[in-house]
Amino acid sequence: MLKDMRRWFWLLLLAVICLAQDSVDPWAKNELMEPAALAAALHSAKPPVILCTAFSALYRSKRIPHALEAGPGSKPEGIALLKKAVADLPKDADIVLYCGCCPMVKCPNIRPAYHVLHELGFEHVRVLNIPSNMHEDWFGKGYPAEAGT
């Protein structure tokens, strides 16, 4: 019986470790930006630079106004596009990243883009908090959008 309990303990511990790794994000909580805050910032005197790290088809279909295509962050060509998009920006630029292709905890694009921007020395990078997807968490809530090209 003790042997079975030990085995279950180790299996449970392994499962907890695996689940914890899925939920670890490289950004601090204060680096998450809520959709309502970004929607308000779009109308400010100095709106942030908005970078869409989603797949090109998503960017071209519908996006946040003035967002630049900078992805997909999971592909080398997307990282090259990201680097090109920020090449002329000052390191203290206010940058907001978003993807929204899927639930953020599973997103393949946002974390690589976040890491690259920090490696390039950008100091003010925030991530748009899109828990489910862009349709549900941004467009479906009536926040500003523009059609792609």
Tell what function each PLM region has.
Residues K29-H43:
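A short, well-structured juxtamembrane/interface segment
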